[in-house]
């Protein structure tokens, strides 16, 4: 699908400058399979290992777990301007998250310890206005996974979000509080995060 998207972009540009037809028309996207993200049982140990491996991956994992943001876009694209002045909250506009609604997310103190506020327009990982490339954390996670002996089959960077969701449900016992914290439009979506609950 990624190659199809890139080729389509090139063909669309070629059509703008005079190409007469779109050879990508009629080619369907490959359907992707849903992925089960297995939650972590030993979250502290995994987080410590990630911290020793790479500071950016560690911060991404912490924010994914503690703030329940999606790692590959919502976390990767964070700027210092998305944080409140005291770093206690993250403000995400609707065009920056999957639900399409504005979200205000509390930042736990154990995450604030790793944050040093920078220029409001700068990305928290790159230190520049541009975020890191969209495969940055995917690639970093693959490299970490290869050298780690702690991870189980099905545990991904996204598993930190699932583990955080389970932790919230254990603490509150409320599916509606979990739904609100996750930014889901439906309780049914939030329930899928609890399938790893034991």
Task: Describe the function of each predicted region.
Residues 1-26, 69-73, 143:
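N-terminal DNA-binding recognition helix of tyrosine site-specific recombinases/integrases
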Residues 3, 43, 56-60, 134, ...:
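Short, leucine-enriched amphipathic alpha-helices that occur as contiguous helical runs
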Residues 16, 62, 66, 73, ...:
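C-terminal catalytic core of tyrosine-transesterase DNA break-rejoin enzymes
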Residues 17-22, 31-49, 97-109, 120-124:
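DNA breakage-rejoining catalytic core of tyrosine-based enzymes
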Residues 22, 26-72, 76:
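Basic, Lys/Arg- and aromatic-enriched nucleic-acid-binding interface segment
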Residues 76-116:
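Conserved tyrosine-mediated DNA breakage-rejoining catalytic core shared by Y-recombinases
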Residues 96, 112, 182-198:
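Catalytic-site neighborhood detector that most strongly recognizes the C-terminal catalytic loop/helix
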Residues 108-152:
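Active-site/catalytic core of tyrosine-dependent DNA strand-transfer enzymes
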């Amino acid at each position: 699908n990624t190659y199809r998207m890139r080729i389509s972009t090139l063909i669309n540009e070629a059509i703008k400058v005079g190409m007469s037809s779109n050879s990508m028309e009629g080619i369907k996207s490959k359907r992707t399979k849903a992925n089960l993200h297995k939650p972590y049982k030993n979250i502290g140990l995994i987080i410590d290992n990630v911290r020793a491996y790479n500071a950016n991956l560690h911060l991404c994992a912490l924010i994914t777990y503690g703030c329940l943001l999606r790692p590959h876009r919502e976390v990767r694209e964070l700027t210092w301007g998305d944080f409140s002045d005291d770093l206690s909250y993250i403000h995400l506009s609707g065009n920056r998250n999957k639900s399409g609604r504005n979200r205000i997310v509390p930042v736990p103190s154990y995450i604030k310890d790793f944050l040093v506020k920078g220029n409001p327009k700068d990305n928290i990982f790159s230190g520049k206005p541009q975020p890191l490339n969209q495969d940055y954390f995917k690639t970093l996670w693959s490299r970490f996974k290869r050298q780690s002996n702690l991870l189980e089959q099905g545990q991904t960077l996204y598993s930190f979000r699932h583990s955080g969701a389970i932790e919230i449900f254990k603490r509150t016992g409320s599916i509606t509080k979990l739904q609100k914290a996750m930014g889901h439009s439906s309780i049914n979506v939030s329930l899928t995060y609890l399938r790893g609950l034991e």
